[in-house]
Amino acid sequence: MKGDKRRDIRDILLHDETLFRNMNAFDPDYVPENYRYRESQMEALAVCIRPALRNGRPVNAVILGSCATGKTTAIKKIFEMVESTSEGVVCCYINCQLHTTRFGIFSQIYSKIFGHQPPETGVPFSRIYQTIMQHLASEKRALVVALDDINHLFYSKNANKVLYDILRAHEVFEGVRTGVFAVLSDIEFRYALDKNVDSIFIPQEIVFPPYTREEVFNILRDRVRVGFYPGVISDELLERITDHTMDTGDLRYGIDLLRVCGNLAEADASPVIGEEHLERALKSTGPVNLIHTVRTLNENEREFLRILADAGEDMTAGALYELFRESTGSSYSSFNRIIEKLEFLRLIDTRLTGKGVRGNSRILIPRFSREDLRRCPGF
């Protein structure tokens, strides 16, 4: 029996037939060749960058829209077009989930300009900043920085510093022309800025509305055509996947469902994706927003969530900290910072109980089920 099982596993690993023509088509970072339904937003982005191509200053923009509405893809597409047109504009896309510090942001800008990262030690931030701005001034190049998920810079309390450093550079370095595309889903974003930043960051608002059902179906069908060989999945099954995608409100869920269905069908040595593969995929896939957020957490933050989920009930901060300290050895101040971050990311809620010192004892409440968390990669 064990020998048969080993042969089954070996067959799966060595099987050289595939349903996938291009598995990358189902990756979260994939930029499709056929990018539809965002022509007006692309035009608005182009209008913001156009002055930089004419030796002027780019127009700042706030790019608003819920998750998976095409914001990131639109920016990457327009940046590719600009860079293929002119060397006079540096277009730098930065994922603020991954880079949350002032040094991290400007290291990405430095890398974009010079082709390599600056030294991580021994070089002060001021020198890196000066090198960037002197290059822009001497080469007469404009800089446009897209700060994707800029809310993470607000959590790390670096948003105002970063925006100030970019947008007021011309006051110190004559001739420098800079602009920022701030990408987020919070329409109240600009009101969180310091006055000295708010006075210079007067952005155009570019809104990415949710896709309609017809648009979602067509986008998923485009991915199917690129990612699978012909005949792998029927339009009827794609309609069902579209319905589930609309229920979640997140296009990434549908794209991920296609990938999981394809993998399950391959494991069964099936030439097509069937109803049974979709049913199994639905049971194995967690909420897409939770999955994408959890991917950005470090190991201590994930351990915090594991402990809270394993408890099976709401916990006081004190009780959770005792378990967290035993597991990680972290200090209470680190524990508190994790609470603040996870609450900011809407993974947990907190509620004062009125007990404890000065009545500040807190109950920690997860905003997800244990089962959903367990279905996230890394748990």
From Swiss-Prot:
The UniProt entry, under SMART domains, shows: Cdc6_C
Out of the domains of life, which is the source? Archaea
One Pfam family for this entry, by name?
Answer: AAA_22
Q: Which Gene3D superfamilies match?
A: 1.10.8.60, P-loop containing nucleotide triphosphate hydrolases
- GO molecular function ontology, one term from the record: ATP hydrolysis activity
Result after altering D148N = Retains some ability to be labeled
Which positions are annotated as binding ATP?
T69, G70, K71, T72, T73, Y211, R223
Q: Which GO terms describe its biological process?
A: DNA replication
Which UniProt key words apply to this protein?
ATP-binding, DNA replication, DNA-binding, Nucleotide-binding
Q: Which InterPro entries match?
A: AAA_22 (IPR049945), Cdc6_C (IPR015163), Cdc6_lid (IPR055237), ORC1/CDC6 (IPR050311), Orc1/Cdc6_arc (IPR014277), P-loop_NTPase (IPR027417), WH_DNA-bd_sf (IPR036390)
Post-translational modification remark: Autophosphorylated on a serine. Phosphorylation is inhibited by binding to MCM. Both single-stranded DNA and double-stranded DNA inhibit the phosphorylation reaction.
Q: How does it assemble?
A: Interacts with MCM.
| UniProt cross-references to PANTHER family, sorted A to Z | CELL DIVISION CONTROL PROTEIN 6 HOMOLOG, CELL DIVISION CONTROL PROTEIN 6-RELATED
Q: What does this protein do?
A: Involved in regulation of DNA replication. Dissociates the MCM complex and inhibits the MCM helicase activity, suggesting that it may function as a helicase loader. Binds to both specific and random double-stranded or single-stranded DNA.
Q: Record's family?
A: Belongs to the CDC6/cdc18 family.
Relay the domain remarks. The N-terminal AAA+ ATPase domain and the C-terminal winged-helix (WH) domain are both required for DNA binding.
The protein in question is named ORC1-type DNA replication protein 2
